[in-house]
Every structure is written in structure tokens, then in C-alpha cells.
């Protein structure tokens, strides 16, 4: 049986042994989303083009690798766990200076594909760019997950997530919310819906069962899942030993309250037995 709510697997793309940097947009207008999710793998020391987006902000998280961000004339050190907002119109780039391929997941907010971002390319980044003195970021948003405190969510509203953090939201001036969730074995985010916004999430690692409407599907590291606003959904960790790590975006909602969160009830034993895709 096919799934109603898009689940896109990028595991092979992420783990490909190719020696080339690569970029993919697994969620876009093709799946009915008004926000585009991207996945970017950069090889060590590859020099990209500077670029900007005239029509949208870019939100991203660096999941693997380290190096340097460019933002206008600034050069900022980049490390795992960095969550970043690049304002529309700001020229930017990332160079991976680690010894392994980096992984960045991000979102072009309110743009249904790359063309709709108003992308414009500049010159190639040079070695002189990388030699520029590193500084603190001035403009946009940059915060590391390690500097963000876990939220104290109400378990009575279905939040049985072990560690839930909101690195980007209206608290630091963003009209969308970037979240990172860790589900230890047995943890669950019970049935709920968002009346006011779509949700896109990416499974960094782990294995679980996801519900979306009538869909019941096993998810694992490398899956993107798109949830339309108003659709009941949930996530349960199926592993006895490993956590699930998830990062996602509440598109166009600057807080959990702004999503129009509605608790819908328990995930039942029958739910956990079912598979529809």
C-alpha cells in the first residue's frame, strides 16, 4: 500500500562514497510543500560559489563536519550542532574543513523550489577568503544546540520526548521554529496535529514507527517526512537500545503555540502493529 503523506529516503545520497559535493531537495512543491527542505553534503576543502536568495530566508543545521561560514564579508567558525538563519539577500557560503564529508540539513522557508528562492550565484570562494580572520556572526542567527536548554513540555499533551530543544524560533527573531528531538527507547510523541502550519522533519539516526493520518510506516536515519497542517501524526521509538534523533521545522510558525498544536490521544498497541507502507 502506498503512503499518503510523503516519506523520502536520502540515506544512499548521504552515505554515497562519491568524491563530489552534492545537494538535493527531498521535500518541495512536488510533495505539496510551500517550503523546500534541502540536504547538502560537502567534501573536505571543496570551494563552492558564494550565493544568496532574494526571496526567502534559509534555515539550516550542521549535522556533521566543521569549517567556516561566510556571511557577507564575515568569516565565522562552523561546528556540529550549529543552527543558522541566513536572511534573504545575504550572500553566504559554507566550506567543510574537516577530514570527512559534512552534512547540512536546511529549509528555504516559503519557497516551493530552489528557483523560487531567487537564488543568485557569485564568484567561487577562494583560499584568501578562508584566510580571513574569523569573527562572531553579526546579522542573521547562529546558535549551537549545546547552548540551548531542553524545553519543559507537558506530558499530558503527549510530549513524551526525552529531550526537545528549540534553537530557532520567535525567541531569537525567526517566524518559523527549528526543533531537535531525541527519543530514547520507548519514548513517543503521541498523536497530535498542527492546525496552523506544515511540518517537515528529518531522521538523523535511529529507528521508529511514524503515523501520519492513516499511514503507519517504519522510519530510520535518512528519512524526510512531510506533514500537512491539520494532519494527525506521531512518532514512537521502536529500538530497545538506541535513541532516535530528529530535526525539523514548523513552517511559518514561530513557536509551538503558534503551530496550533492539538493533542489527539494515545498511540495504541494496534497502531504499533500496523504497517501501511
What are these regions (language model features)?
Residues 85, 100-118, 226, 241-259:
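A short hydrophobic beta-strand segment most commonly corresponding to one strand
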Residues 73-88, 214-230:
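Short acidic-glycine-tyrosine-enriched beta hairpin
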Residues 20-25, 38-53, 160-164, 179-194:
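Conserved short histidine dyad/triad with adjacent acidic residue
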Residues 95-97, 236-239:
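Asparagine-centered strand-capping/turn motif at beta-strand->loop junctions
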Residues 40-43, 52-69, 107-109, 181-184, ...:
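Short, conserved beta-strand element in jelly-roll/cupin
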Residues 1-34, 116-176, 260-277:
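A short, N-terminal "cap"/entry segment at the start of jelly-roll beta-barrel domains
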Residues 66-68, 75, 91, 101, ...:
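Structural motif
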Amino acid at each position: 500500500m502506498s503512503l499518503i503523506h510523503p516519506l523520502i529516503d536520502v540515506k544512499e545520497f548521504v552515505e554515497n562514497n562519491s568524491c563530489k559535493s552534492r545537494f538535493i531537495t527531498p521535500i518541495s512543491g512536488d510533495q505539496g510543500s510551500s517550503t523546500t527542505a534541502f540536504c547538502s553534503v560537502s567534501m573536505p576543502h571543496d570551494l563552492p560559489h558564494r550565493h544568496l536568495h532574494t526571496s526567502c530566508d534559509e534555515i539550516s543545521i550542521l549535522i556533521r563536519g566543521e569549517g567556516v561560514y561566510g556571511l557577507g564579508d564575515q568569516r565565522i567558525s562552523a561546528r556540529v550542532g550549529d543552527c543558522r538563519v541566513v536572511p534573504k539577500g545575504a550572500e553566504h557560503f559554507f566550506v567543510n574543513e574537516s577530514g570527512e564529508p559534512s552534512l547540512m540539513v536546511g529549509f528555504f522557508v516559503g519557497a516551493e523550489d530552489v528557483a523560487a528562492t531567487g537564488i543568485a550565484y557569485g564568484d567561487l570562494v577562494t583560499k584568501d577568503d578562508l584566510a580571513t580572520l574569523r569573527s562572531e556572526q553579526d546579522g542573521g542567527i547562529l546558535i549551537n544546540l549545546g547552548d540551548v536548554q531542553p524545553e519543559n513540555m507537558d506530558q499530558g499533551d503527549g510530549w513524551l520526548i526525552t529531550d526537545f530543544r528549540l534553537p530557532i524560533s520567535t525567541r531569537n527573531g525567526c517566524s518559523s521554529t527549528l526543533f531537535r528531538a531525541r527519543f530514547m527507547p520507548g519514548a513517543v510523541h503521541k498523536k497530535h496535529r498542527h492546525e496552523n502550519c506544515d511540518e517537515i522533519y528529518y531522521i538523523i539516526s535511529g529507528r521508529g514507527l511514524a503515523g501520519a493520518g492513516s499511514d503507519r510506516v517504519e522510519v530510520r536515519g535518512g528519512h524526510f517526512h512531510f506533514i500537512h497542517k491539520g494532519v494527525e501524526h506521531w512518532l514512537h521509538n521502536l529500538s530497545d537500545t538506541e535513541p532516535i534523533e530528529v530535526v525539523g521545522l514548523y513552517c511559518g510558525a514561530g513557536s509551538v503555540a503558534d503551530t496550533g498544536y492539538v493533542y489527539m490521544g494515545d498511540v495504541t498497541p494496534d497502531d504499533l502493529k500496523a504497517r501501511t507502507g
